A protein has these predicted regions:
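Helix-turn-helix/homeodomain-like alpha-helical modules used for DNA recognition
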Residues: 236-274
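DNA-binding alpha-helical recognition surfaces that contact promoter or target DNA
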Residues: 131, 176, 200, 204-207, ...
Length: 274
């Protein structure tokens, strides 16, 4: 017996194996892989759907689970192509100044997968996916979300950026190497972060202890073995981001999407032309 969502699963599998999607694992945004952020947007979106509709069985009547899943996978795909093509504009700049670049890439990828699998997306589904991608920056982009799916992804992307897009490097990570005599450049390499991140984390720690110099902070670390890393909001963001990164690295970006609970509610006849 053929599963009602066999085509949907194959399409998403093919998309996840598309090179620009796989390359999201190689793109870093403030210390967080873009692939990790992409999963976070999916997870937040699912939680938003459950909050509003309680049960996924009810939500599927109002929300296109296929479009929202594919839209999320593709929402930052241009970060891969922009890097590969050495474009002058960043992803955020492209969303405002050249949204045609974003939308043309979406349709190109969808067309390639359709051709590879021999499936054709229903026009409304295709357009919904494209709209999700080109409107996911909301008021910070050129196109505003106009569908239920696009609005969910916009809010989820915004929350992920606010709470989970921060390099989880902490002052204690830096001081651990400083106490061994390593300089700024050496610590940058050890922690795989920029000098700006290091200086920010030291500034936050000094502020919490009301200290003026790095030497004073280092003395506190020597005495106590650790220092406060920042205010409550920063601590929350840092710890949650660290857990998120560890979880996605362990479970795998591909596996998390293929096992996401929206998959079982997808119905091929509502997604693909017959």
């Amino acid at each position: 017996m053929v599963e009602k969502n066999s085509k949907s699963k194959k399409f998403i599998d093919c998309l996840l194996n598309f090179q620009d999607v796989k390359d999201l694992e190689l793109c870093d945004d403030q210390g967080v892989k873009v692939s990790t952020h992409t999963y976070d947007v999916l997870n937040i979106s699912i939680n938003k759907i459950k909050e509003k509709y309680i049960k996924l069985e009810e939500a599927q009547k109002k929300v296109d689970f296929f479009a929202i899943t594919v839209g999320i996978i593709m929402h930052d795909i241009s970060k891969s192509s922009i890097k590969r093509n050495e474009e002058n504009l960043s992803h955020s700049q492209m969303m405002i100044q050249n949204p045609e670049y974003i939308i043309s890439e979406v349709y190109e990828v969808l067309n390639l997968i359709e051709k590879q699998l021999g499936y054709t997306l229903i026009k409304e589904v295709r357009e919904n996916i494209a709209h999700i991608v080109q409107s996911h920056h909301g008021k910070w982009g050129k196109i505003q979300p106009a569908t239920e799916e696009a609005n969910i992804v916009y809010i989820a992307d915004m929350e992920s950026a606010k709470y989970h897009r921060i390099n989880p490097i902490q002052a204690n990570d830096i001081l651990k190497y400083s106490i061994k005599g390593l300089g700024l450049t050496e610590i940058e390499k050890k922690l795989n972060c920029t000098a700006a991140v290091i200086k920010d984390r030291i500034r936050r720690a000094k502020k919490e202890l009301n200290l003026k110099t790095f030497a004073e902070l280092l003395e506190v670390y020597k005495e106590k073995g650790r220092v406060p890393i920042g205010d409550k909001f920063f601590v929350l963001r840092s710890e949650e981001t660290k857990k998120l990164k560890k979880f996605v690295d362990k479970q795998g970006f591909y596996n998390l999407f293929m096992k996401n609970p929206l998959m079982e509610y997808m119905i091929d006849d509502k997604i693909f032309e017959k």
